[in-house]
Amino acid sequence: MVSFDATEALAPYREGRGYGAILFDRERLRQADASLFSPQSWGDRARPVDAGGRGGAWFVDAPFGHSVLRQYLRGGMAARVSRDRYLWKGAGRTRSFAEFRLMRELIKRKLPVPRPLAACYLREGVGYRAALLMERLENVRSLADHAQVAGRGAPWEATGQLIARFHRAGLDHADLNAHNILFDAGGHGWLIDFDRGVLRIPATRWRERNLKRLHRSLLKLRGNRSREDVDKDYARLHRAYELAWGRGY
């Protein structure tokens, strides 16, 4: 369960035929409006993110610091129905508000995640659109990048230890792939993209599901490397994970 946070602020707004709300960190933002979530409003201070994901993300040079703006987009078969609209089930269950609050809870638990700054939804009828603004992690590279460039020299053991920390805290990451694991120049690891993530009682089934998803993503990214090489790298990651899990950190 995600606890209540007194530093959150809520600002309702209207746009066209819809109405919505913005949830924001009042320690970082004095006020918030819908323009925060429009890349057009940022002009040349916003540029598209071209690594991983399905688009809909921008690096933003904002007055309150370097940030990432992400609009929620659907993938797969669901995108044929609507690219950016989700079924309304209540404000607290919007993708943006849920991810904002989950990230803040993970930070409270001393886990390395980017700080969320603001989240919004705009409801029109039975559907809504949503977006999230968060701090940008500077000078980081994804595990996907490390794996393609360094291969065996990528931080496999550090990745296993990092995932074990999050699993110990109960995080079930809905999309644990090599693009969502980042390392800075000092070797410190971070996780990103907590859309549809939840906190659970640690259990083998969902932990292994997360790890298998990561393994599949590494296989997809292997390029000219053999499956055997990728499996060996993943085995190193998994051994480090099991050791860290067994130690309790």
Curated annotation (Swiss-Prot):
Keyword set includes Transferase: yes
Residue positions of the active site: D175
GO MF, one annotated term: phosphotransferase activity, alcohol group as acceptor
Location within or outside the cell: Cell inner membrane
Coiled coil: none
Domain of life from the UniProt record: Bacteria
GO cellular component: plasma membrane
Transmembrane segments: none
Listed GO biological process terms: lipopolysaccharide core region biosynthetic process
Entries under InterPro entries matching the protein: KDO_kinase, Kinase-like_dom_sf
Topology of the protein relative to the lipid bilayer: Peripheral membrane protein
A Pfam entry, by short name: Kdo
Entry annotated with the keyword Cell inner membrane: yes
SUPFAM superfamilies on file: Protein kinase-like (PK-like)
Keywords: ATP-binding, Cell inner membrane, Cell membrane, Kinase, Lipopolysaccharide biosynthesis, Membrane, Nucleotide-binding, Transferase
Annotated catalysed reactions: an alpha-Kdo-(2->6)-lipid IVA + ATP = a 4-O-phospho-alpha-Kdo-(2->6)-lipid IVA + ADP + H(+)
EC numbers on record: 2.7.1.166
Role this protein plays: Catalyzes the ATP-dependent phosphorylation of the 3-deoxy-D-manno-octulosonic acid (Kdo) residue in Kdo-lipid IV(A) at the 4-OH position.
Similarity field: Belongs to the protein kinase superfamily. KdkA/RfaP family.
Protein's recorded name: 3-deoxy-D-manno-octulosonic acid kinase
UniProt source species: Xanthomonas euvesicatoria pv. vesicatoria (strain 85-10) (Xanthomonas campestris pv. vesicatoria)
